């Protein structure tokens, strides 16, 4: 399963700073909230961050990154399904950022057929397919 990521901004951020017109505008004129390990995972995102003038907040927590984006501190990169669940966030799909990340489950081979573990794995699989 591939988890899809996109850029999001809050309505309060967009009313104050406007929408970025393109990636260059994002880098030069907009505030970015950043999860520190994302650049090591996606070269496309690293290139954007390296060229950004205003990285205003950095965190190692997905929950904190989402909170900062919702609070209007800056634009953030989030799983699309998570960002779309937040009523105040707008997906900036017009920028054309298409980043995905593999999502997988690991279990010990001796336990994967136990009913409780199999039920949990099946449940996680069903939930992630809805993301």
Predicted stretch roles:
Residues 1-103, 129-131:
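C-terminal regulatory
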Residues 95-131:
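A late-sequence structural motif
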């Amino acid at each position: 399963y591939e988890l899809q990521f996109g850029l999001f901004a809050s309505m309060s951020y967009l009313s104050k700073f406007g929408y970025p017109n393109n990636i260059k505008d994002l880098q030069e004129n907009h505030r970015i909230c950043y999860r520190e390990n994302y650049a090591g995972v996606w070269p496309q995102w690293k290139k954007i961050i390296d060229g950004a003038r205003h990285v205003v907040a950095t965190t190692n927590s997905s929950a904190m990154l989402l909170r900062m984006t919702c609070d209007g501190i800056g634009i953030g990169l989030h799983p699309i399904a998570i960002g779309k669940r937040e009523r105040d966030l707008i997906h900036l799909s017009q920028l054309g950022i298409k980043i995905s990340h593999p999502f997988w489950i690991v279990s010990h081979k001796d336990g994967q057929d136990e009913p409780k573990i199999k039920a949990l794995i099946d449940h996680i699989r069903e939930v992630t397919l809805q993301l």
